Amino acid sequence: MNINVAELLNGNYILLLFVVLALGLCLGKLRLGSIQLGNSIGVLVVSLLLGQQHFSINTDALNLGFMLFIFCVGVEAGPNFFSIFFRDGKNYLMLALVMVGSALVIALGLGKLFGWDIGLTAGMLAGSMTSTPVLVGAGDTLHHSGMESRQLSLALDNLSLGYALTYLIGLVSLIVGARYLPKLQHQDLQTSAQQIARERGLDTDANRKVYLPVIRAYRVGPELVAWTDGKNLRELGIYRQTGCYIERIRRNGILANPDGDAVLQMGDEIALVGYPDAHARLDPSFRNGKEVFDRDLLDMRIVTEEVVVKNHNAVGKRLAQLKLTDHGCFLNRVIRSQIEMPIDDNVVLNKGDVLQVSGDARRVKTIADRIGFISIHSQVTDLLAFCAFFVIGLMIGMITFQFSTFSFGMGNAAGLLFAGIMLGFMRANHPTFGYIPQGALSMVKEFGLMVFMAGVGLSAGSGINNGLGAIGGQMLIAGLIVSLVPVVICFLFGAYVLRMNRALLFGAMMGARTCAPAMEIISDTARSNIPALGYAGTYAIANVLLTLAGTIIVMVWPGLG
């Protein structure tokens, strides 16, 4: 039996789509030195090659892919978007605006200089910024621009062509820039990170290994009684001195949960909760030959929960003001926008931040109720909320504003992005509403993006050879300029106008470019995770601004003549 693969793929859009995805994902795992191609460029290359052979796909699949991707970008940005927009994140907002705005202006200028159409110009901007949200926003706006069919088809083909030709240029140039730009300025990045660490009390905690607290029991002897000198637990400050917290006391056979007025007596058996290294550092009067095994005394359920910051008495407060240790709880991690932050007493909490807290189950529940809620440990997605807000986003995208002879429409990209932000924001405020496990959200987002990339590649593949010959050199030059010049402008603005700490500034610059590989290089150069504070500050707002940049560049292009 002979199987004609070409006819089989041309006759089955679903089969063609998943063949492109599978081959592209395999290609994306290849490395060029220390640089991995990545899923999006792998799928794009495979789809362009197959597109040259005149394979095509139903455009409805392409549209659904970009809609899912943009909606999920909004959901991820939602919990932190408004806090960054309205509060003390104004520096991060301004940095993101400078980065995206300067790239947009430069791309428009280069597009006019080289005589390109809007498709090539927007594609070059998206590729140079390694930003699929720009590509998606521009593609959606082109569909609603009112172009005639032939002109629209050419613009969409050029959009994906420009992206394909400049993506690797943008990625490699930014990674090289992240490695060498810190060395060209007069402040050492490691010194800047250490300065922030000293100012914020991170010298000991920033590199602390995270362990779960353990519970051990000790008998109070004469040495320990002498050590306490008749002071009650509040006056002793056991946690400040030892790093452990007295959770229970057995006295005369009776178990009790002590309060601050309790005084240790000879023969008491005490249960201490703390990290393993804290137990190891205990004064010898606690440890030497005095550890006991008491099943009832040690019968305690130590849990680790992810607590989402929500309540007004926690939002805007510093970590130190929560006084978790005073409530017998231990902080393991601080996560913002899927980025792990340094455990810094001076970090100001935003709504939607996630604190990983360990301690007795009752105490963790109490502290969670005080600052927010315990994240639902469920693998069940609230599909009703997901679908409802998706519909709302599409309806918002249909809104059109008429100004005399000029009409302006929101478009699906802006509508779905706004609806996604609202769903993410409401999820951060209502624990039982709109829950989407991070794994599920990432899968839908990645799948939507890959479907979109496959569609644009298959569509543009037939014209790539002509495009390479005519504009390849121009694209190389333009890609380098749009990738690196906004980074330099952003650095100058942050360093000399905002006067930001260099470690935070470089992290924020990589966040404004939404480039995780470059962020890793900055952290390695600083030998610290301090830059993650800046990265998280700009990342969420940059994703939104980049999507809007794709819309704006298409809208303003006709007016530039």
From Swiss-Prot:
Membrane topology field: Multi-pass membrane protein
Transmembrane helix listed as a keyword: yes
Record-given protein name: Putative transport protein YbjL
GO molecular function: monoatomic cation transmembrane transporter activity
Organism: Shigella flexneri
Gene3D superfamilies in UniProt: Regulator of K+ conductance, C-terminal domain (3.30.70.1450)
Gene: ybjL
Domain of life: Bacteria
Family indicated by similarity: Belongs to the AAE transporter (TC 2.A.81) family. YbjL subfamily.
Signal peptide (from-to): none
InterPro entries xrefs: AAE_transporter, RCK_C, RCK_C_sf, Transp_YbjL_put, YidE_YbjL
GO cellular component: plasma membrane
Chain segments annotated as coiled-coil in the UniProt record: none
Transmembrane segments: 8-28, 32-52, 66-86, 94-114, 158-178, 383-403, 406-426, 451-471, 475-495, 540-560
Pfam families, sorted: Asp-Al_Ex (PF06826), TrkA_C (PF02080)
Chief site of localization: membrane
Domain RCK C-terminal: 200-288, 292-373
Record SUPFAM superfamilies: TrkA C-terminal domain-like
Keyword field: Cell membrane, Membrane, Repeat, Transmembrane, Transmembrane helix, Transport
One GO BP annotation of this record: potassium ion transport
Compartments it resides in: Cell membrane
